[in-house]
């Protein structure tokens, strides 16, 4: 009887904890950020960081490994006792330290210098500098850096402008360019050409919302792009460019996929 009741209580507690964790994830989702955004984040005490008026407790950043937090880490000395690898990474908007938890009982080599990585985890402030602690993985596709920067731009736009389209910016992509400057990637946009930027945006939309083989329709792509001040004509032109370059294909039911 007691065992049954204890099991019931344990299940209820586990269910409650799981619900609380899911609620916390909804309230504080993992935010794609540039390093510039992290370095310029507002500190409100207790190690809490605020970006675009929202508290950030979990984040994803990308960058190239340019050094190690521990000078002996490259040879393995000191990393095991600390139970983490610390990497200094840059995305050309700034530089921070990201940490990867490791199993002290397993032999593990640090990621080599000059490798492009994606770091995701908890955001903390250490010695007055932001750090991300969690997982650090190598990026196989160099385009992931561009897609991450676009994610950071779009997230900044959603949080600062919502779905409103600034008057006078319709079709110009100016709101996207302004947001690119805000997150520090304005010089990374190919030639500053909005049409080139739109092709990257459309590929990003399909990657995130295409649902496997389903892809996205022209109407869905147009609606997504219009939220960021691009016109239907802009979308059609960009999709023709992507099709000509072999970056997207049209399915039998007139949808687009990559």
UniProtKB/Swiss-Prot annotation:
One Gene Ontology CC term in the entry: chromosome, telomeric region
UniProt name for this protein: Replication protein A 28 kDa subunit
Role description: As part of the heterotrimeric replication protein A complex (RPA/RP-A), binds and stabilizes single-stranded DNA intermediates, that form during DNA replication or upon DNA stress. It prevents their reannealing and in parallel, recruits and activates different proteins and complexes involved in DNA metabolism. Thereby, it plays an essential role both in DNA replication and the cellular response to DNA damage.
PTM per Swiss-Prot/TrEMBL: Phosphorylated in a cell-cycle-dependent manner (from the S phase until mitosis). Phosphorylated upon DNA damage, which promotes its translocation to nuclear foci.
Positions with biased composition (Low complexity): 1-24
Subcellular location as annotated: Nucleus; Nucleus, PML body
Disordered, as annotated region: 1-28
A single GO BP: nucleotide-excision repair
Family to which this protein belongs: Belongs to the replication factor A protein 2 family.
InterPro entries, sorted: NA-bd_OB-fold, RFA2-like, Rfa2/RPA32, RPA_C, WH-like_DNA-bd_sf
Oligomeric and partner information: Heterotrimer of 51, 28, and 14 kDa chains.
Pfam families named in the record: RPA_C
PANTHER family in alphabetical order: REPLICATION PROTEIN A-RELATED, REPLICATION PROTEIN A2
Taxonomy of the source species: Eukaryota, Discoba, Euglenozoa, Kinetoplastea, Metakinetoplastina
Major subcellular location class: nucleus
Record keyword DNA-binding present: yes
DNA-binding region listed in the record: 60-138
A GO term for molecular function: single-stranded DNA binding
Keywords: DNA replication, DNA-binding, Nucleus
């Amino acid at each position: 009887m007691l065992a049954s009741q204890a099991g019931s209580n344990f299940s209820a507690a586990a269910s409650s904890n799981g619900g609380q964790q899911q609620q916390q994830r909804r309230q504080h989702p993992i935010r794609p950020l540039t390093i510039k955004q992290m370095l310029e984040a507002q500190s409100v005490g207790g190690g809490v960081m605020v970006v675009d008026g929202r508290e950030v407790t979990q984040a994803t950043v990308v960058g190239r490994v340019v050094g190690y937090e521990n000078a002996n880490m490259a040879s393995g000395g000191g990393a095991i006792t600390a139970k983490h690898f610390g990497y200094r990474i840059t995305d050309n908007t700034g530089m921070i330290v990201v940490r990867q938890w490791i199993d002290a009982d397993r032999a593990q080599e640090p990621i080599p210098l000059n490798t492009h990585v994606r770091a995701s985890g908890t955001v903390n402030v250490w010695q007055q500098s932001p750090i991300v602690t969690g997982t650090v993985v190598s990026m196989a596709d160099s385009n992931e850096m561009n897609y991450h920067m676009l994610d950071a731009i779009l997230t900044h736009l959603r949080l600062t402008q919502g779905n409103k389209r600034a008057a006078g910016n319709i079709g110009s992509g100016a709101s996207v360019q302004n947001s690119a400057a805000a997150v520090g990637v304005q010089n990374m946009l190919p030639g500053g050409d909005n049409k080139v930027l739109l092709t990257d945006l459309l590929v990003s939309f399909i990657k995130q919302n295409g649902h496997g083989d389903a892809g996205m329709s022209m109407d869905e792509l147009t609606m997504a792009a219009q939220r960021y001040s691009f016109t239907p004509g802009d979308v059609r032109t960009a999709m023709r460019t992507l099709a000509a370059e072999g970056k997207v294909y049209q399915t039998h039911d007139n949808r687009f996929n990559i």
